[in-house]
């Protein structure tokens, strides 16, 4: 049976080879060479290729197949390069397709940036001659746009003359800046144990419902107001309701001003209901807006991405639609490349900086999953949100032992900050080690020294909680922003034993240490009466 299959295969192969005589093969090879756009190099430098390609923008093709979000388009001449944007003609709403693959000599396989309902074979498609271009500049502040730069806030067109392609090269090594400076957020647990670097990349890791989006909203509230620069928020594959809530909260807090041009933030949304093409590109759209402020205006920009996992997830969907063989856990084989291409553009140059805060959903709370694990390599600081801490009612539910920062170094943060942070982590680690003994034998079996460790650790654990301004309506506590000096002083005094006499509940949901003392006095009065 096998030999028969082999004979048939070899016969068909030789038949195919006989059919393709040298004289027939030569013009075909020449045709393929002619079809390649000018300035294209063999390297997979698609962004540069798309930008360097001739900007004719007049090639017209026709749709030959529609398979969900994948559309095949045939061009009789002028095959568009990879990553070029194509526009479908004869539709009420604008539909942009991005070239993903070349199938043979005259057909391209594209990914749609919007729904493909109503598309029919034979419809005309126009090559724009460039990658997707979006509006950039101060006019984008206070506005919401989608992946292709269309305003979706019902406030008319974005009046700007400046447009930029969403695919670009990362800055050269020579342009990068190496200065290190702490970015104070006003959140105690973050500033003390895993401080953020100005111009760095920060990851917020956590499973479903542990508070990633609330923490991002608080950071926008604290840092955008205190830092005074521009912010860009990219909503990637998250809930539309949260995007809407965020927009209205920004209007109420004055970060977005509808009356004049004093808005501080630009919003770019590609939410859960969007096709995978839009979700895979919307992070790049947000990044392009931020790059303009960094490179052209010399600003220190804050870029918030919620959620970077959805970027990977959308890339995985696109990869499957294009028929690529999946890699580990079903992710796309180009996972590290896709992530690296985007993350390398988020950097600090000599002109300005982009500090990015990225919420990272951790599937099934598994930090070894390829999506969060690939993201780890790019980050300067990681803030890990823990379900176990959230279950204790301690918010923000930041894990003080798992969260890390590259700048937690005495040469950068200073000896006092470093010593207090390490002291806090040591006492919390000791408490964690004693928990098994407490569970089996109870507190009474501990030595006096261990009892003191447990008492201080529980106070520190509660003092790491903090009421947020954006969560006032849920908690009933007024939001607090704590300066770094106050944070260090408070934890230093708890470690020194100055507040051993206060009850641990006095340290829960307060700002600086003075509030804990006042709360303890209030509790004593209530208890006394």
From Swiss-Prot:
Protein residues bound to phosphate: 209-213
Positions bound to Mg(2+) 2: 238
Reactions mediated catalytically: ATP + H2O + 4 H(+)(in) = ADP + phosphate + 5 H(+)(out)
Keywords for the protein's UniProt record, in alphabetical order: Acetylation, ATP synthesis, ATP-binding, CF(1), Glycoprotein, Hydrogen ion transport, Ion transport, Magnesium, Membrane, Metal-binding, Mitochondrion, Mitochondrion inner membrane, Nucleotide-binding, Phosphoprotein, Transit peptide, Translocase, Transport
SMART domains: AAA
Main location: mitochondrion
Residues annotated with Phosphothreonine modification: 312
Residues the record lists as N6-acetyllysine modifications: 124, 133, 161, 198, 259, 264, 426, 480, 485, 522
GO molecular function: angiostatin binding; ATP binding; ATP hydrolysis activity; MHC class I protein binding; proton-transporting ATP synthase activity, rotational mechanism; proton-transporting ATPase activity, rotational mechanism
Modified residues (N6-succinyllysine): 124, 133, 161, 259, 264, 522
Residues the entry annotates as binding ADP: 209-214
EC number(s) stated in the UniProt entry for this protein: 7.1.2.2
PANTHER family: ATP SYNTHASE, ATP SYNTHASE SUBUNIT BETA, MITOCHONDRIAL
Protein name listed in UniProt: ATP synthase F(1) complex catalytic subunit beta, mitochondrial
Organism: Mus musculus
């Amino acid at each position: 049976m096998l030999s028969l299959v082999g004979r048939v295969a070899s016969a068909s192969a030789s038949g195919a080879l006989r059919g393709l005589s040298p004289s027939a093969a030569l013009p075909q090879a020449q045709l393929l060479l002619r079809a390649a756009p000018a300035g294209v190099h063999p390297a997979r430098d698609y962004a540069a290729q798309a930008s360097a390609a001739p900007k004719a923008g007049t090639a017209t093709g026709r749709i030959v197949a529609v398979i969900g979000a994948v559309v095949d388009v045939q061009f009789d001449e002028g095959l568009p390069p990879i990553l070029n944007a194509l526009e479908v003609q004869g539709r009420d709403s604008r539909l942009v397709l991005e070239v993903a693959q070349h199938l043979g000599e005259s057909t391209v396989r594209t990914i749609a940036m919007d729904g493909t309902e109503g598309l029919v074979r034979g419809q005309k498609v126009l090559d724009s001659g460039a990658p997707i271009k979006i509006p950039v500049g101060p006019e984008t502040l206070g506005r919401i746009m989608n992946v292709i730069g269309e305003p979706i806030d019902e406030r008319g067109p974005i009046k700007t003359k400046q447009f930029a392609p969403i695919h670009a090269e990362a800055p050269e090594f020579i342009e990068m800046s190496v200065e290190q400076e702490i970015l104070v957020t006003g959140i105690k647990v973050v500033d003390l144990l895993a401080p953020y670097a100005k111009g760095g990349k920060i990851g917020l890791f956590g499973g479903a419902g542990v508070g990633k989006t609330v923490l991002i909203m608080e950071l926008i509230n604290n840092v955008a107001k205190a830092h005074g620069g521009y912010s860009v928020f990219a909503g990637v594959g998250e809930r539309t309701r949260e995007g809407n809530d965020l927009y209205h909260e920004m209007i109420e807090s004055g970060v977005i001003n509808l009356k004049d041009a004093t808005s501080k933030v630009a919003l770019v949304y590609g939410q859960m209901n969007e096709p995978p093409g839009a979700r895979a590109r919307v992070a790049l759209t947000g990044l392009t807006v931020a790059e303009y402020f960094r490179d052209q205006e010399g600003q220190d920009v804050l870029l918030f991405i919620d959620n970077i996992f959805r970027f990977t997830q959308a890339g995985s969907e696109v990869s499957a639609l294009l028929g690529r063989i999946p890699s580990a856990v079903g992710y796309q084989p180009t996972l590290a490349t896709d992530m690296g291409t985007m993350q390398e553009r988020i950097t600090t140059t000599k002109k300005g900086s982009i500090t990015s805060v990225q919420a990272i959903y951790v599937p099934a709370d598994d930090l070894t999953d390829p999506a969060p694990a690939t993201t780890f390599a790019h980050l300067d600081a990681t803030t890990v949100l823990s379900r176990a801490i959230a279950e204790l009612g301690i918010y923000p539910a930041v894990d003080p032992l798992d969260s890390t920062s590259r700048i937690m170094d005495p040469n950068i943060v200073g000896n006092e900050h470093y010593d207090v942070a390490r002291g806090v982590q040591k006492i919390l680690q000791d408490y964690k080690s004693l928990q098994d003994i407490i569970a089996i034998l109870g507190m009474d079996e501990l030595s006096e020294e261990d009892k003191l460790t447990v008492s201080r650790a529980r106070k520190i654990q509660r003092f790491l909680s903090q009421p947020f301004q954006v969560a006032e309506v849920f908690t009933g506590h007024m939001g607090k922003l704590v300066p770094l000096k106050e944070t260090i002083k408070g934890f230093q005094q708890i470690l020194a034993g100055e507040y051993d006499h206060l009850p641990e509940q006095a340290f829960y949901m307060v700002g600086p240490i003075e509030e804990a003392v006042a709360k303890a006095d209030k509790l004593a009065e209530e208890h006394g009466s």
